[in-house]
Amino acid sequence: MNVIVFASRKGGTGKSTLAAHLAAHVHKATKPCLLIDADPQGSLTLWHKLRGTNEPAIKSAVNSVSGIVSAAKRDGIEWVFIDTPPNMSAVVEDAIRNATMVIIPARPGVFDVNAVQETILSCRAARKPYAVVLNGAPARRDEVESPIVTIARESLVKFRAPVWGGQITNRADLLMALGHGEGAREYYAEGRAAAEIGRLWAAIERSVKAIRGNASAGGAMHKQAA
């Protein structure tokens, strides 16, 4: 079983958004997923209610996710996506300890980029693989990323933080889909938003495969990233 945790001590970075879109992208009968909403704000739970279906299934966690994760493993769940609150509380630390990989969303601005440091330190302390995902980014122009995205990448290098090479652009389709209780691919499969979510998922899958291979070989898992 693979556990993907979305964590950042800053609010509004896109933890719930990415968790919802990726879960909707991945879930199917042959690849069952579970959502865990550990954020008291309940954004992921709201999205799930708007879906009008119990697929993927969702559980709420207040102080700990460990029991839910253990039960999911017994039930044969393949992927677990955990949304966490914007802090470094006990439930966030517990989620990181249970993670196969931690995704740290950050918008390409000085406040968001600076805020990733505490989450990075927690991942390193727990020896858990992690990667920063630039979310809510300005659209590329002629396939060239915005200068502010480039600056964000350069800043993250100073933290020795692995950063996904792509970006999730600030697109209306992402918000419209959530309002309908859908993921980007369900809302408009041929859209650019769906394509970016698909590329992010492909990167996560590759990383998890590398993490699993490294763990089998006794390698340093906390150095793996998307």
Give the positions of each predicted feature:
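P-loop/Walker-type NTP enzyme "switch/lid" segment
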Residues: N2-R9, T13, A24-E93, V144-T150, ...
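Hydrophobic positions on the alpha1 helix immediately C-terminal to the Walker A/P-loop
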Residues: L18
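Inter-motif core of Ras-like GTPase G domains
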Residues: S89-V110
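G-domain G4 guanine-recognition motif of GTPases
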Residues: R107, A131-S146, G166-A177
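Conserved C-terminal guanine-recognition region of P-loop GTPase G domains, centered on the G4
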Residues: V113-V132
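Beta-strand-loop-alpha "switch" segments that mediate conformational coupling across diverse proteins
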Residues: A152-E182
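Inter-lobe coupling/hinge region of RecA-like P-loop helicase motors
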Residues: L175-G198
